[in-house]
Amino acid sequence: MITITLPDSSTKTFDGPVTGEQIAKSISEGLWRECVAVEVDGAAMDLSEPIATDAAVRLITTRDPEGLHIMRHSAAHVMAEAVQRVFPDAELTIGPVVEDGFYYDIDMEPVSEEIFSRVEAEIKKIVSAKIPFVRKEVDKAEALDRYRDQPYKTEILNEIEDDTVSLYTNGDFTDLCRGPHVPHTGFVRAVKLTKISGAYWRGDQNREQLQRLYGTAFFSKKELDAYLTLIEEAKKRDHRKLGAELDLFSFHEEAAGMPFFHPNGMKLWNALLDYWRLEHRAAGYVEVKTPVMLDRALWEKSGHWENYRENMYVSVIDDNQYAIKPMNCPGGMLLYKEKRYSYRDLPLRVAEIGLVHRHELSGVLSGLFRVRAFHQDDAHIFMTPDQIEQEIFGVLKLVETIYSTFGLGFHLELSTRPAKSIGTDEQWVKATAGLRAALDAYGKGYAVNEGDGAFYGPKIDVHIKDALGRTWQCGTIQLDMSLPERFDLSYIDAGSEKQRPVMIHRVIYGSIERFLGILIEHFAGKFPLWLAPTQAVLLPLNDDMIPYAREVRQEFEQAGIRTEIDDRSESLNKKVRQAQIDKIPLIITLGGKEKEARTLSVRTLDGQVRHGVSHEAFFAVAKEHIAKRLQTPVVFA
């Protein structure tokens, strides 16, 4: 007899080995039809695999996130088979699931998106046939013989240490794969190829260049259509497109991956950092600045030279090797060591907007999202062990304050001790307990990623959600037990003994360049008044009004409102249209009537028009919006 325990703690008994499919059918036909795989004692398996011992079982359905992941894995196989039908000489490599879909790297002649319709036609045939995915475990030697003419698969096989490997076959197509897969190709109900790009085998630019075909898949056409609509909206909001249209930033081949910020971009940048500094001063942080280039010996001491050397830019000065910093932390350690600290001086909260450089392959550079030079809003908090909870809680509240100002929701994930780590059991228990206690006190809920912490300490990752519902990992609250040890940091406790401080390394914006890119897309370039590069534009009705417009601009600037004048010899309608294209929140018309009455005709970006607004009333509303950093539309009575 075999006893199967279900998630609700109920049990089912079977006379002998049983499959997930049989378990599902024993519960209901409807459940069986929606099952894609089964989780047995925490491990995902095919529905057709026998379960030979007592086990805790969870049926994975089309409603579960894991179900979608498994189906997309199967969709990658279906796409690969379809490609081989269209291009018989194409040689397959690997095809993993990624966020929002999957891809397959294929060795074939360069192709374009023109092939998508032909490949998708074959996909439809494969899906309609509802071909079963059949798993077969074979000796590694047999697999090597099977793939002897396929060097990519042979390379993968030679790296596998197990004596047996699994192959999956659906119809005439077989691929090396761990699985699991959906029962048959009919579960891949709605598929769309999305893009194609070049990729190096194993990410090594010295290896073969492949064609990477991306796709996505859903369990229903309705879900696919909703996703494609989202993608189209995302294209309209693409920060690279809006960055050019709004004259915010640019890139040049003379400095690949290093953005050039234009005057409009710098206004946005400064507004972002002015706000950051305001909140950090209020939260008790001091700001510092450390050098961009530091001696190799420092990077050896910090461990970066050993673990991060390939991503660092190095130079030789006076026969000494220096590295441009990829991270701000080591410089912060040197600053701490300059002074002698007592327990009464702690916690010490030190923040830095530091410029860092990291070498990224040219193929992965992507606008402001993936660059080689960027600024990071690092902070290091030095504290005693019993201050961990209160300091983590304080950072969480600061995170909430800052993200809510931009209308960004977020969720939290706690990552605990990995298999390889430094520090004692006692240190890890106390550190993790401090993070948990702070999260529990914060009270907003969190997920736990067991074993996913850094080797030097547990961490909290903060994932923000933008206006399109996309999530971005920006903030990190990392407890670091490595650097205080490496740099021999200390403080004097109440008993006049030296102690090692606990250190939190945290970022909120993360890469400021990347965060700006996220904000551009979040707001679709229509920034709230306080953040907009140009907050108001003055449109003189004729050349005679230009001197008056200059007077008004000076008045606006003195009131703290970033203002420009459009004095081109164009019609008012064209000027208004240009201001709308430039997404300027307040568009103000100045004519003889307005000059005589000392009033303003104000048009907002959302189409509201108000005539006869006094300067005093205008300033009262605009200054309140800016001071309070409101996201709501500006409304004039």
Curated annotation (Swiss-Prot):
Top EC class for this record: ligase
Superkingdom assignment: Bacteria
GO molecular function, one term: threonine-tRNA ligase activity
Binding site for Zn(2+): C329, H380, H505
Keywords: Aminoacyl-tRNA synthetase, ATP-binding, Cytoplasm, Ligase, Metal-binding, Nucleotide-binding, Protein biosynthesis, RNA-binding, tRNA-binding, Zinc
CDD domains from the UniProt entry: TGS_ThrRS (cd01667), ThrRS_anticodon (cd00860), ThrRS_core (cd00771)
Gene3D superfamilies, sorted: 3.10.20.30, Anticodon-binding domain, Bira Bifunctional Protein, Domain 2, Threonyl-trna Synthetase, Chain A, domain 2
Signal peptide: none
GO annotation, biological process: threonyl-tRNA aminoacylation
Entry's cofactor comment: Binds 1 zinc ion per subunit.
Listed EC numbers: 6.1.1.3
Record's GO cellular component terms: cytoplasm
Main location as per UniProt: cytoplasm
Annotated segments matching region Catalytic: 238-528
Subunit structure: Homodimer.
Stated family: Belongs to the class-II aminoacyl-tRNA synthetase family.
Protein name in UniProt: Threonine--tRNA ligase
The organism of origin for this protein: Desulfosudis oleivorans (strain DSM 6200 / JCM 39069 / Hxd3) (Desulfococcus oleovorans)
